[in-house]
UniProtKB/Swiss-Prot annotation:
Family classification: Belongs to the THEM4/THEM5 thioesterase family.
SUPFAM superfamilies cross-referenced by the UniProt entry: Thioesterase/thiol ester dehydrase-isomerase
Chain positions found as Phosphoserine: 28-29
Molecular functions per Gene Ontology: long-chain fatty acyl-CoA hydrolase activity
Binding site for substrate: 175, 196-197
Protein name: Acyl-coenzyme A thioesterase THEM4
Keyword line: Acetylation, Apoptosis, Cell membrane, Cell projection, Cytoplasm, Fatty acid metabolism, Host-virus interaction, Hydrolase, Lipid metabolism, Membrane, Mitochondrion, Mitochondrion inner membrane, Phosphoprotein, Transit peptide
N6-succinyllysine sites (modified residues): 46, 57, 89, 98, 197
Pfam families: 4HBT
UniProt-annotated location(s): Cell membrane; Cell projection, Ruffle membrane; Cytoplasm; Mitochondrion
Gene that encodes it: Them4
């Protein structure tokens, strides 16, 4: 899955994001402020808010960093990625400017509600995830494809800390179904690097760590600017 590599690479060294709010334009600088969807909203349950606050405490000493998350890619990031990796005959800048991140394309509370935190020293990324009602598979439970998506997003953040990368393989073992609207912890860690190959492990557990819902391993490949994707 192609992800917003350029934006996330900047984010790993970025300053904390602003509080949520509709995108607006500042008259002084004409700079657009985009809404950060990785901050609490009214659809978040008490459990998700509590976990979020706990991880924000961990961020205070600098060991963890909260990852901002936006609905649309910055235009500059799109242009940079296409310049490096996309053949000119496939570039559609006007259409791409209207593209949205899949996990942030749902109405509030209906899809992927999550906040992501990154630890550079431990090479870990943790997502606090609440699956909304429009992610249903078997009645009452989160669809397996939605679970795979949040795994891909979380492990991908681990991988791109080492450079622009794309998913090559996801190996997922579903152990227990995840109830809709429940809160789970998606914990991923970069295990090893072999050349351009990045190997990442991942688990999904209940917030009390007593239930293991899913185990996964992922392989990502660092992209070579000398080799276009198309």
């Amino acid at each position: 899955m192609l992800r917003n590599c350029a934006m996330r690479l900047r984010t790993l060294g970025a300053t904390p994001a602003r509080r949520p709010g509709a995108a607006r334009r500042l008259f002084s600088s004409e700079k657009v402020i985009r809404k950060d969807y990785a901050l609490p909203n009214p659809s978040w349950t008490k459990d998700l808010r509590l976990l979020f606050d706990q991880f924000m405490k961990k961020c205070e000493d600098g060991s963890w960093k909260r990852m901002p998350s936006h609905r649309q890619n910055p235009t500059r990031a799109i242009q940079e990625f296409q310049t490096l990796f996309v053949d000119s005959k496939f570039k559609k800048e006007e259409q791409m400017s209207k593209a949205q991140q899949f996990t942030r394309s749902f109405e509030e509370g209906l899809g992927f509600e999550y906040a992501m935190f990154y630890n550079k020293v431990e090479k870990r990324t943790v997502s606090l995830f609440q699956g909304g009602l429009h992610l249903q598979g078997v009645p009452g439970f989160v669809h397996g494809g939605a679970i795979a998506t949040i795994i891909d997003v979380t492990t991908g953040t681990c991988a791109i800390s080492e450079g622009v990368a794309m998913t090559a393989n996801l190996n997922i073992t579903y152990k227990k179904p995840i109830p809709l609207l429940s809160v789970v912890v998606v914990n991923s860690q970069l295990q090893k690097i072999e050349g351009r190959k990045l190997f990442v492990s991942c688990t999904i557990q209940s917030i009390d760590e007593k239930t293991l819902y899913t185990e996964a391993t992922a392989l990502f490949i660092k992209l070579d600017p000398e080799k276009p994707l198309t």
